[in-house]
């Protein structure tokens, strides 16, 4: 037995000691005492210990005298937890540093890195990534300046009246051009609309009328083809009154001077307001008819620039609305049944354009008080008296015809959100040559199609779909655009992201204006800093504006006018839109809507800079399309509407005392505005703290952002009765403008009631005010609730 114990002790002496601390699970504080415990339990390492610097199993056992290197393995295992912990700390620190840097760069540049090499059905990103500067370079490299000028010249030479046979030929030519591009879809959309044209057999006439009512000398209307579409037909007789621009304040000034307006024929200057607004206001004040002329004072007096001939009249429709006025609120498809109604925007009085020469003859016959100095124009022989003057008889024989019009569409599908559309369009038709009116826009549109098609061939693919549209019927009040919106409204308000209009984009080379939704103002500012000024070398468009006006948006940004196709997108469909244009420094383009709107006159007006200005517009529009179609997060400033509401509320504050005296308050409006601002700020914080690589989350945010404009369409009025439901931009009793106008009656005699649909003299009505306030408040509150997202996130303390 003693021999056995002795042998066992010898074996234990030479056998490697099993280290419990290496192989057992060590956690928490025990880890700190690991090496100390090992030293206490074990012996000193042998002198022949090999340090752990092996790179593979082939070197195991390389130490002399040891076949099983358990001692050095034990030391390696002792160091392993420290190595793991150190690696984790380094990795975590690097990850956090990279994350913060990435978030900061995204916040600073607004999604400046655009992945354009992805495929719809593949996660493979091996095709590469293009940065914003690369994408800009690609776009500018393919954009062709010379092609656009040639297209403007050739298009202006072609007759293209809406619905005409020659227009059909142009449609086919454009379709042929599009078919040669790398596009996913090309198609047309035909509507049968009611258009009004002059009757060649029975032209419109204007006669003097004697004191006994007899028809006397006929005044020449030089061009019988110049007319006002949608004017009331028949004859109107009355004494002539000069009414400046025919604005509401102009007619109120005439009433204050005891000039009789009821039963008169008003002579008004073209400009400032649309033809339709002039006629509607004249009708409100009881006039029997309207004559509209171009005064030389409204155009450039530069002798080096061409001017409008004094025997030319200006064309313009007088429907206070957009689309086919004989199917209001409904699309004009063939064989579709409609209720027998007409648009409330159709006038009940006739209107006719006349030349400056004819207006001069009329003004010289006027008596009565002399017009204010600011009302006087530049007709040399005219004293500019207010009237009344001799009697006149106006006869309008326009006739309505059912006419097919065709819109042309081309599409590049997006790879990530193909069901969201970024739309850009331009009017194609024109009453005359229409170089500035529609040839410029058509040329830019076709060049952008070609440019983006070339980019697609070079690997570019937008995240969202690009939709290019050539509109017909624009000269009759954006008929083609509005009918398309009416036909597909239930789809478009969910899918259309933004509309960009190219109409009237080059009317000069001096000032730049953007008529737009507030959602696009910040993006426009950013893009202006990327586009070179066409007439100030070394400056961007933003530099050009900011140099003279530190508050650039006050100088550049304007509300959308009703005579723009962009207006229907926003006020009717709830889609944010923009229409931008270059204009003369101090005067309007004189040839718009005349037969002198030729390529030659446009070229002379811009003194040879037409190609440069057109190129600047194309660059601006193209870069807008790139940002809107490819940024992961839509670059729409939804928070800006909070400032818009605040500005409008400022107009209401002046009446708070009057309302308080009647026991009324505007507190609900203030509360709704506060809820909207809080919802916008909350959404902004959610987006900032989110990962842009999360496609599902980004899509959820984009859906909420792109519908903000739609939230401001009143849900409490019928689209058929009030098609322009936007509470800031629309028309009707539900709008903020109508509410302010009604409040003004608290301090007036009610003379403005007619414009709000009331009989003159009724004045302020408390029941009507309460209804207006409710419609406005709940539309604002609905916008705030929708922006909040899910119902459990809504602030219900209203």
From Swiss-Prot:
Pfam family, one: PA
Record keyword Zinc present: no
UniProt main location, coarse: membrane
Extracellular side: 103-798
Topology Cytoplasmic: residue spans: 1-81
Region span, Disordered: 25-44
Annotated TM spans: 82-102
GO BP field: acute-phase response; cellular response to iron ion; endocytic iron import into cell; intracellular iron ion homeostasis; multicellular organismal-level iron ion homeostasis; positive regulation of endocytosis; positive regulation of peptide hormone secretion; positive regulation of protein maturation
Keyword Glycoprotein (UniProt): yes
InterPro entries named among the record's database cross-references: PA_dom_sf (IPR046450), PA_domain (IPR003137), Peptidase_M28 (IPR007484), Peptidase_M28B (IPR039373), TFR-like_dimer_dom_sf (IPR036757), TfR1/2_PA (IPR037324)
Cellular compartment(s): Cell membrane
A GO term from the CC aspect: plasma membrane
Motif (Endocytosis signal): 23-26
Molecular function GO terms recorded: co-receptor binding; transferrin receptor activity
Membrane topology: Single-pass type II membrane protein
Family the UniProt entry places it in: Belongs to the peptidase M28 family. M28B subfamily.
Job description of the protein: Mediates cellular uptake of transferrin-bound iron in a non-iron dependent manner. May be involved in iron metabolism, hepatocyte function and erythrocyte differentiation.
Assembly information from the UniProt record: Homodimer.
Protein name: Transferrin receptor protein 2
Species in which this protein is naturally found: Rattus norvegicus
Lineage: Eukaryota, Metazoa, Chordata, Craniata, Vertebrata
């Amino acid at each position: 037995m003693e021999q056995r114990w002795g042998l066992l002790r010898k074996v234990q002496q030479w056998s490697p000691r099993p280290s419990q601390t290496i192989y057992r699970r060590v956690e928490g504080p025990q880890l700190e005492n690991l090496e100390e415990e090992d030293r206490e339990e074990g012996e000193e390492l042998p002198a022949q210990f090999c340090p752990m610097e092996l790179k593979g199993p082939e070197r195991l056992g390389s130490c002399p005298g040891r076949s099983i290197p358990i001692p050095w393995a034990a030391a390696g295992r002792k160091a392993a937890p420290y190595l793991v912990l150190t690696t984790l700390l380094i990795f975590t620190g690097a990850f956090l540093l990279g994350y913060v840097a990435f978030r900061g760069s995204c916040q600073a540049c607004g999604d400046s890195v655009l992945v354009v090499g992805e495929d719809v059905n593949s996660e493979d990103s091996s095709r590469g990534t293009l940065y914003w500067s690369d994408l800009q370079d690609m776009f500018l490299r393919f954009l062709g300046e010379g092609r656009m000028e040639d297209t403007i010249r050739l298009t202006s030479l072609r007759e293209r009246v809406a619905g005409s046979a020659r227009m059909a030929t142009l449609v086919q030519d454009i379709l042929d051009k599009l078919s040669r591009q790398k596009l996913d879809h090309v198609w047309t959309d035909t509507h049968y609309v009611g258009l009004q044209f002059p009757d060649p057999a029975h032209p419109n006439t204007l006669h003097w009328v004697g004191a006994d009512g007899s028809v006397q000398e006929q005044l020449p209307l030089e061009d019988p083809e110049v007319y006002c579409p949608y004017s009331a037909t028949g004859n109107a007789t009355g004494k002539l009154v000069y009414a400046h621009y025919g604005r509401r304040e102009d007619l109120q000034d005439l009433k204050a001077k005891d000039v009789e307006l009821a039963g008169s024929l008003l002579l008004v200057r073209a400009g400032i307001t649309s033809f339709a607004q002039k006629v509607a206001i004249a009708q409100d004040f009881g006039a029997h008819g309207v004559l509209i002329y171009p005064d030389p004072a409204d155009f450039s007096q530069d002798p080096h620039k061409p001017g409008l001939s004094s025997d030319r009249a200006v064309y313009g429709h007088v429907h206070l609305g957009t689309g086919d006025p004989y199917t209001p609120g409904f699309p004009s498809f063939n064989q579709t049944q409609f209720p027998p109604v007409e648009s409330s925007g159709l006038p009940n009085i006739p209107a006719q354009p006349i030349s400056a020469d004819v207006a001069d003859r009329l003004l010289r016959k006027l008596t009565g008080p002399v017009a204010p100095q600011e009302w006087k124009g530049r007709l040399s022989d005219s004293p500019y008296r207010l009237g009344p003057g001799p009697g006149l008889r106006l006869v309008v024989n326009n006739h309505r015809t059912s006419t097919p019009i065709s819109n042309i569409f081309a599409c590049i599908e997006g790879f990530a959100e193909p069901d969201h559309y970024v739309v850009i369009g331009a009017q194609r038709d024109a009453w005359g040559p229409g170089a500035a009116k529609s040839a410029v826009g058509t040329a830019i549109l076709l060049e952008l199609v070609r440019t983006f098609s070339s980019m697609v061939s070079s690997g570019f693919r937008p995240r969202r779909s690009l939709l290019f549209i050539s509109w017909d019927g624009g000269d009759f009040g954006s008929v083609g655009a509005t009918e398309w919106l009416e036909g597909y409204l239930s789809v478009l308000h969910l899918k259309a992201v933004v509309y960009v209009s190219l109409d009237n984009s080059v009317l000069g080379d001096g000032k730049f204006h953007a008529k737009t939704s507030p959602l696009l103002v910040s993006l426009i500012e950013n893009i202006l800093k990327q586009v070179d000024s066409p007439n100030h070398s070394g400056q961007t468009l933003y530099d050009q504006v900011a140099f003279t006006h530190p508050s650039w948006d006050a100088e550049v940004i304007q509300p959308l006018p009703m005579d723009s196709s962009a207006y229907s997108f926003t006020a009717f469909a709830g889609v944010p839109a923009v229409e931008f244009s270059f204009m003369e420094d101090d005067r309007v383009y004189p040839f718009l809507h005349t037969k002198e709107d030729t390529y030659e006159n446009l070229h002379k007006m811009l003194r040879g800079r037409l190609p440069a200005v057109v190129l600047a517009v194309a660059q601006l529009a193209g870069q807008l399309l790139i940002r809107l179609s490819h940024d992961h997060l839509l670059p729409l400033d939804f928070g800006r509407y909070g400032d818009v509401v605040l500005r409008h509320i400022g107009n209401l504050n002046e009446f708070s005392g009057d309302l308080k005296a009647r026991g009324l308050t505007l507190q609900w409006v203030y509360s709704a505005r506060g809820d909207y601002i809080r919802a916008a700020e909350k959404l902004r914080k959610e987006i900032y703290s989110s990962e842009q690589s999360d496609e599902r989350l980004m899509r959820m945010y984009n859906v909420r952002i792109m519908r903000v404009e739609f939230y401001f369409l009143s849900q409490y009025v019928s689209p058929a009765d009030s098609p322009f439901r936007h509470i800031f931009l629309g028309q009707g009793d539900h709008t903020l403008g109508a509410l302010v106008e009604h409040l003004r009656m608290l301090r007036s005699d009610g003379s403005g009631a007619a414009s709000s649909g009331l009989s003159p003299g009724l004045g302020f009505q408390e029941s009507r005010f309460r209804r207006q306030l409710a419609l406005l408040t709940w539309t604002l509150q609905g916008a705030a609730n929708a922006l909040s997202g899910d119902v459990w996130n809504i602030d219900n303390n209203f």
